[in-house]
Amino acid sequence: MGVFMRDEGRMETEDIILGKAKYEDWRSIYRNVWSRPETAEYMVWKVTADEDGARERIQRTIVWQETHDAWLVYERGSGQAIGFAGVEETEPHIYHETGIALGPEYVGRGYGKQILRLLMEYCISLDGQEFYYSTRAGNLASRALALSCGLTYHHSERRTDQRSGKTYELEIYKKNLESVGVGYEAG
């Protein structure tokens, strides 16, 4: 069961917490996510090369999260920052996820499903009616996550990777939120 604590800027499930970044998170998010090429592969960000870069990046992340619906993902048991996630309202009542990333050691534990369900429930709490999720066509784990959470394929768009200049297919998945709950209560 998920819980929202808006006054504290966080959401929780049994295994994870979505919370706003703090400076001291730089080391764990760097080690678990930002330094990992396998995590960046299907994303639109570049790997952070060193600890100094991670310290600078966490400062930018903190500033960004102050004005956006974006969070770090913390593993409840260890308290470590193991990923990030976010959403944005693109039109009234229409939300898009803005990226979900987990460090490779944390994939396959059900955390992605918990994150995606929390994001959808958060959007419902904001009177969201449609939720969109996107993934690169080759990212089979991300596609499986979308389908496992009840999203359906909507359409594809050809995009250009700003890092490499190569084109790729971005698959867009959709779920109507007003008619179907996602298994969590807002508190």
Feature locations, PLM:
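A short helix-loop-beta-strand connector motif used in the catalytic cores of GNAT acetyltransferases and
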Residues: 59-72
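Hydrophobic residues in alpha-helical segments
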Residues: 33, 43, 62-65
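Acyl-donor (CoA/ACP) binding surface of acyl/acetyltransferases
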Residues: 1-28, 32-36, 74-187
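Secondary-structure boundary/capping positions in well-ordered alpha/beta enzyme cores
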Residues: 46, 68, 126-130
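Conserved GNAT-fold acetyl-CoA-binding loop/helix
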Residues: 38-60
